[in-house]
């Protein structure tokens, strides 16, 4: 067995683990929390026939995050290919074609809803991202893949009409896209309206970030216009900015779910980095020196406005998903 110390720390969830001589776990919290974690821990390890996994739970708000952490440890230690998938409010643990564990929420889930498996494409929860942008979809796919969800985008639905972004706020635009497309497709849809807010420009480009340089805007033209607008702003503190994301999830006959997040930083004086898209080459992250375009995909997902918003979303998503 390896001596690796595994750790996962996200908002509301903090787990530590290692492999030793026997299965064991500890946790902070009340007796109810202890019993809930004990049940998940022992059922999973018994089903997968795993010995020697030791777990310490500092904080937990998500059963899915706990199962995903344990499965990731087991996969790394034993070179297995176990997957954790969300389906109709339940959490499924499987490997290849074998289902090992079904973890239901406390309030259960309806049989009719759970066993709606008319074909393989209906297995596993799917989210339709309301965008044609493959770069944005790639980020969401990496984030949601860790959460057991399959991701589609509008390129999979070429006959859908374009939804005009006529809102004056990020939430208005995100809600308009998600709710319209959900009604047209009957699917669960997530729309993110994201943009860059520059303090020296009164919050611009804001909801106009994608078309800041005009109707024929490109990333390069938008970046050039932003540098032009800030040409006489020399003090770094006055070049402060935030990437903002509003996520809206909509589904038929449901009240939409809304979360928001921001990523603070500064606008540089020249583009740097080859990764990312949009204003990433100009956005200096936090108090550091690297731009968002100089971060790896994993680093960006951990820090970014979109990554933060998705993590917030997944804290409230399971409960919302089960609501009538």
Curated annotation (Swiss-Prot):
Keyword annotations: Hydrolase, Magnesium, Metal-binding, Nucleotide metabolism, Nucleotide-binding
Annotated GO MF terms: dITP diphosphatase activity; ITP diphosphatase activity; metal ion binding; nucleotide binding; ribonucleoside triphosphate phosphatase activity; XTP diphosphatase activity
PANTHER family: INOSINE TRIPHOSPHATE PYROPHOSPHATASE, INOSINE TRIPHOSPHATE PYROPHOSPHATASE/HAM1 PROTEIN
Species name: Streptococcus agalactiae serotype V (strain ATCC BAA-611 / 2603 V/R)
Protein name: dITP/XTP pyrophosphatase
Biological processes, Gene Ontology terms: nucleotide metabolic process; purine nucleoside triphosphate catabolic process
Catalytic site: 193 (proton acceptor)
Cofactor: Mg(2+)
E.C. no: 3.6.1.66
InterPro entries noted in UniProt: dITP/XTP_pyrophosphatase, ITPase-like_fam, RdgB/HAM1
Subunit structure: Homodimer.
Location of region: Unknown: 1-127
Pfam families found in the cross-reference section: Ham1p_like
GO cellular component terms, A-Z: cytosol
Highest classification ranks of the organism: Bacteria, Bacillati, Bacillota, Bacilli, Lactobacillales
Binding positions for substrate per the UniProt entry: 131-136, 194, 277-280, 300, 305-306
Record-listed Mg(2+) binding positions: 164, 193
Chain spans, region NTP pyrophosphatase: 128-324
